[in-house]
Structure formats: C-alpha cells, structure tokens
Swiss-Prot record:
Subcellular location field: Cytoplasm
Binding site residues for IMP: 13-16, 38-41, 131, 145, 223, 238, 302
Species of the source: Podospora anserina (strain S / ATCC MYA-4624 / DSM 980 / FGSC 10383) (Pleurage anserina)
Protein name per the record: Adenylosuccinate synthetase
UniProt pathway annotation: Purine metabolism; AMP biosynthesis via de novo pathway; AMP from IMP: step 1/2
Top-level division of the source organism's lineage: Eukaryota
C-alpha cells in the first residue's frame, strides 16, 4: 500500500466500510485513528453482514492485525460486545488480532450520562443531535486534562479517584439531569481490569515498527470532514479531528509513508442530526433517496436527512484533506431519477455574488441560495455493470463532471450493496 487512508468527505455514512473491506483484504494492519463507537458501518462478506462501530473492519481478514489508536475514545463495554458479536457470526481468532493503544482515552458510562444532560439543557434547533454515547464529553475531559487513559485502568486507586472526582463535578453542574451510578461503573471496571491486559499495547511504537518494516497499513477514518471539530459545520460536529490531520496525529503516522488518501463520497448527500445542509430536499426527491438508499444509521437507527450532491462541500473537503482519489458510492440509488441535481455554487440573495467556497459563518450560509446544475438521469439499473465504459452515457457524464469540478480522479464507483458491486477505474 504501504499506508493508505480512507476518509469520509461529507457528513458521514458515505459507505467507507465497503472500500475498507475490499482494501483490508490486502492490508497487513488496519487501524482506527479517532472517534469512538458513535460511528457505524456494515460490511457484507461471504453473505454475512457485520456491523462495526469501534473495531476496525480488518478483523474480517484472517491475516490482518488491527489497532485502535491513541486518538480514539474507547468504550470498553462496546469493545467486548462487538468482539462477541463478530464471534457469534463465525469470525475466528478475532481476539488475537486486535490491540488498543495504551494512550487512548476511555469513554465511560459517565460520559453518556453527561451527553444526555447536556442535550436536555438545549432547546429546539440548538440541539446538536449527538448519538448520545458520550463521545463529546469524552473528548472534553481529555482536553481539560481530567480524562482517564487506557493504561490508567490498571491502576485501581488512580482510576477510582479520577472517576469519583469527575462524577462529583458533573453532579454539581447538572443536578438531577445527571443520572449516573459511579459505584456501578467502578464494579464493572473491576471485571474489565482482568480481561483487558492482553489487548493493550504501546500504540505509537506499534505503528512506528510497522511503517519502518514496510508493512501495508490501512487507516479507517471515522465520521467525515464536515463533522470535524475544526473544519466541520461547528458546532454541529463531532468532537474529534476526522480528517487527514486526525489520522496522522491519532496514530502517530509518518506522513512520508502515506501513499494514498481516498475520499469517499456518496453520489448524493445525507446528514444525521442537526446542522446546515444546503442541498437537503424535504420533498419527494429526498424521501425517495431515503427509501431507496435505506438511509438510516447502523449505530442509532435514526433516519438520515437526504438531498443532492454538493460540490461546494466536496471542493472544501478536498482543500482540507488533499485526497488523491475518490470512491464514489451508491451511484445506483440514482437509477430511477429522471433528473439529477448537483450544487456547483451558492449565491448571495442580496448582492447576487456567486459564492464558490464553504463559509465558516453558519448564519450567513443559511441566507445563501444554492446554484444547481441539472443532469439527465439514466433510468436503468447499473448494479450488474462491471466497467466504466458499460455505464449509461448519462452516468458516465455525471462521474466525469465530478472529476472535472474537483480535479480529483474517481477510482472506484459503488453500484450496489455487495462487495463485488464496485467498478474499478
């Protein structure tokens, strides 16, 4: 490879898992760099669907080692629950192929309780629409230097003191909104302390040795660029760096060893929870995209908001992440649309100025109109198509326009849910 990074280019749920599954078949190491068990994707292999939230999907490959990196917030209960689920579906030796960086922070039941309390304090459209799994509060305690790292789980007195201090502070802050039993959590970790030792490693050293020895690494990005804490639609974002920078720092990668950065982009756009979404379609087209695309979350079951592809967002995403290629996913979902729209710019309604960049000011963004380009639909199934030249001319034109507009080649095109439903360019 030797090091390949897969990143979401929109608001998540682009279909990163499918490409990860394909590429991890050749990878020797598959790693997660940031996020927690809030992100989820399904991988279909050998007729079986596997759900991944916290664990890298390289666990499907019997010859691939897997690492949860230092930038991830690790929920220990979710870690073991996910391992059990994979074993129940027939995957063997998964416990021998997964490691956790000792520098990763621990996501606790306490953090989920804080998440619920914080959302309860917000009103109406001010709600972020989090998954409720405490990812934001986990990163908040990390940033405030009060967090608990994985290696501290094994220092019982230190762990309990830090946890009790956190619980007392949040109880003072939220009062009755903070529903949490610290003794119950302490009891659970007495059991986890016995189960975890064989899974914990020095994460930076593991990656350093892997890159120096020339092993093929596949890095699975979680969430997506537009949910990045610095570059996303703040404050309607997650609490970690979800782009290229987060992948590098979350795993201590040697950037000189990175060969490819793949941006995964859905052929239309979806978003979960609150926040701006300029191309959202609240009419028939949006409903049709949601139903045909089966747009509801693996982690939460929530229905996703749907709309047209926004190339302003995509160019902005490319500016931040410097992709070397695109994986265009779910092109087949557009099979039945007579007309397909794509956003190519925004327009200031007062001045008439055409805006070709994605602004930081969300209030200003809300005032802008969307400038669309319309494409003729192909209105024929493409799932069985295996080469680009065999695609309908209208579908080819759609793909070529994305390449020309962004200046980045499309290297993979998803044409269906199965692993084999992929065109390689």
């Amino acid at each position: 490879m030797p090091t390949t990074i897969i990143l979401g280019s929109q608001w998540g749920d682009e279909g990163k898992g499918k490409l990860s599954d394909i590429l991890c078949q050749k990878a020797q190491i598959c790693a997660r760099a940031a996020g927690g068990h809030n992100a989820g994707h399904s991988v279909v292999a050998n007729g079986v669907s596997y759900d991944f939230h916290l664990l890298p999907s390289g666990l499907i490959n019997p010859n691939c080692e897997n690492l949860i990196g230092s930038g991830v917030v690790v929920n220990v209960e979710a870690f073991f629950k996910e391992l059990n689920a994979l074993e129940e579906k027939g995957l063997k030796h998964v416990r021998e192929k997964i490691l956790i960086s000792d520098r990763a922070h621990v996501n606790l039941t306490l953090h989920a309780a804080v998440d619920r309390a914080e959302e309860a304090q917000l009103e109406g459209n001010k709600k972020i629409g989090t998954t409720g799994r405490g990812i934001g509060p986990s990163y908040a305690t990390k940033a405030s230097r009060k967090g608990i790292r994985v290696h501290e789980i094994f220092k019982e007195a230190v762990f309990e003191k830090k946890l009790r201090t956190l619980a007392e502070g949040y109880k003072k802050q939220f009062g009755e909104l903070f529903e949490y039993d610290v003794e119950e959590e302490i009891a659970r970790f007495r059991e986890y302390r016995k189960l975890l030792p064989n899974f914990v490693c020095d994460g930076p050293n593991f990656i350093d040795q892997a890159q120096k020895s020339g092993r093929d690494l596949l890095i699975e990005g979680a969430n997506a660029l537009m949910l990045d804490i610095d570059y996303g639609t703040y404050p309607y974002v997650t609490s970690s760096n979800t782009g290229f920078g987060g992948a590098v720092t979350g795993l201590a990668l040697d950037y000189k060893q990175i060969k490819e950065v793949i941006g995964v982009v859905k052929a239309y756009t979806t978003r979960v929870g609150g926040g701006p979404f300029k191309t959202e379609d609240l009419g028939d087209a949006g409903t049709k995209l949601q139903e045909i695309g089966r747009e509801w979350g693996v982690s939460t079951g929530r229905r996703r908001r749907c709309g047209w592809l926004d190339l302003v967002v995509l160019k902005y995403s490319q500016l931040i992440n410097n992709y070397t290629s695109w994986n265009l996913t779910k092109l087949d979902i557009l099979d039945t649309f007579p007309t397909i729209k794509v956003a190519v710019a925004y327009k200031d309604k007062e001045t008439g100025e055409v805006i070709e960049h994605f602004p930081a000011d969300l209030d200003y963004l809300d005032t802008l109109e969307v400038v669309y380009k319309e494409f003729e639909g192909w209105q024929t199934p493409i799932t069985s198509v295996k080469t680009f030249d065999a695609l309908p001319a209208q579908a080819q034109a759609y793909v070529k326009f994305i390449e020309e507009f962004t200046g980045i080649p499309v290297k993979w095109i998803g044409t269906g849910p199965a692993r084999d439903d992929m065109i390689y360019l």
